[in-house]
Amino acid sequence: MKVNLSPMVSSDFKSVLRKRFKVLAAFVSAVWAIQALNWVMDNSLNPAFGLIPRQFTGLDGILAMPILHGSFAHLISNTPPLLLMGALLAATATRALLAVNTIIVILSGALVWLLGSSAIHIGASGLVFGWFGFLVTRGLVDRSPITLGVTLLTGLL
């Protein structure tokens, strides 16, 4: 039995959702393109733009860290949670989506800059875990078992 949810979802919401999914797909595609460029350049983007804790020259890494990866294996491991959590965030978040992402990137990067080891830090894990925390909190606050359940299931995978 096939259920048609189209009449239950407004065309405005569908349009917004389509736009958000396109942004998510463009972001993940850009991260893959940057990794390809980084690979061609023998990973020289990582030391140039990665986050270096407690060094002012490493502060730009706060913004660059989520789009840099150490290898294709690293990116492959980050892609499913980026897509799953990103899709759930796109489907459930409000107009505050840009603000949520900005706060997560800056806060996670600042914490790594303050508390991280002296190594160069790269990868989207801070963003993924930030999305996870936001979605769990959102599920609890909204008392949404679907949001909470899907988020926790995605987190376990």
Each model region followed by its residue ranges:
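A detector for small-residue-rich transmembrane helices and their helix-helix packing motifs
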Residues: 2-157
